[in-house]
A protein has these predicted regions:
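Conserved tyrosine-mediated DNA breakage-rejoining catalytic core shared by Y-recombinases
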Residues: 95, 105-141
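Short, polar N-cap/turn motifs at the start of nucleic acid-interacting alpha helices
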Residues: 109-115, 190-193, 212-231, 256, ...
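DNA/chromatin major-groove-contacting recognition/catalytic segments
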Residues: 128-133, 137, 142, 234-278
């Protein structure tokens, strides 16, 4: 009942259904860790009455040109808070669309050679991501400088040990990060909405347009199933099909034009008109 009350409260605060679903699924993941399925305390139907589905939305990713601008803009030309927000955004993109929560919870020990080995906060799935050369200078510049720091980046409060308090700390950091992204877009991409989800959706979408198989994209994102990935990409599949349809029509029309040209050339030869050649 309290979970349902929380859902109602979120709706009263104008929360979107996908946002509510994210909160509920995050709570469910935490609950499953504290009370694993099969334990005496576990209640299998605890989340049955609340919204945990994902609705396919209009596209939330950037175009290739927009992403290129964010990757090539000189960070030194931006205000300090925007510099860090854009640096984290770039790293999330370079790390195969890593969610901000996973970036925030990364630990120093997760760096193994030239890779990051970590468990996704949402699913517990282990991920291994190679650090590309484009990310190495950012990683060096923005990682925690404190020698005894547990976390790779100075996002979470080192002194907080309680899981619930640490998650509250993460939510504050997330709000601060999104505000930094708002300032960034006001400066670099006016009228474009960018949030913490955008790096992940952009990576998936651009990979899709590059021709990567959905199964490969799903594995790269650490999705629990291909269906989740299809939800990410559904708004873009119609666009891709429409573009393919345009290409098909153009190729057929041009083929007809080529045939008509050849027919005309034959006719000209037949009636004795010289054929102009290039």
């Amino acid at each position: 009942a309290r979970l349902k009350d929380y859902e109602v409260w979120l709706r009263q605060k104008n929360g979107k259904w996908n946002t509510i679903s994210t909160y509920m699924r995050t709570l469910r993941a935490v609950y499953n860790r504290v009370c694993p399925p099969g334990s005496a305390e576990y209640r299998p139907k605890l989340f049955d009455g609340v919204y945990t589905r994902v609705v396919s939305q209009t596209k939330r990713s950037l175009t290739e040109d927009q992403m290129r601008m964010l990757l090539t803009t000189d960070l030194a030309s931006l205000p300090q808070d925007v510099q860090r927000a854009l640096a984290y955004f770039r790293l999330m993109f370079f790390f195969r669309g890593m969610p901000f929560i996973d970036l925030a919870y990364l630990r120093q020990q997760d760096i193994q050679g030239n890779s990051i080995v970590y468990c996704r906060h949402k699913t517990g799935q282990q991920m291994t991501v190679r650090v590309p050369k484009e990310a190495q200078s950012l990683l060096k510049e923005y990682r925690s400088k404190h020698p005894d720091s547990v976390y790779l980046f100075p996002i979470l409060d080192e002194t907080v040990k309680d899981d619930a308090e640490l998650y509250a700390c993460y939510l504050r950091a997330l709000r601060h990060f999104n505000k930094g992204l708002e300032k960034m877009t006001a400066l670099l991409l006016p009228d474009v909405k960018v949030s913490s989800y955008t790096a992940r959706h952009t990576w998936a979408t651009l990979a899709f347009y590059q021709g990567l198989l959905i199964g490969v994209i799903s594995k790269a994102l650490g999705h629990s199933s291909i269906k989740v990935t299809e939800t990410y990409l559904k708004p873009f599949e119609n666009e891709k099909v429409d573009n393919a349809n345009d290409d098909l029509i153009v190729s057929i029309v041009r083929f007809k034009e080529r045939k008509d040209y050849k027919y005309l050339a034959v006719q000209k030869r037949f009636i004795g008109i010289p054929l102009l050649t290039k």
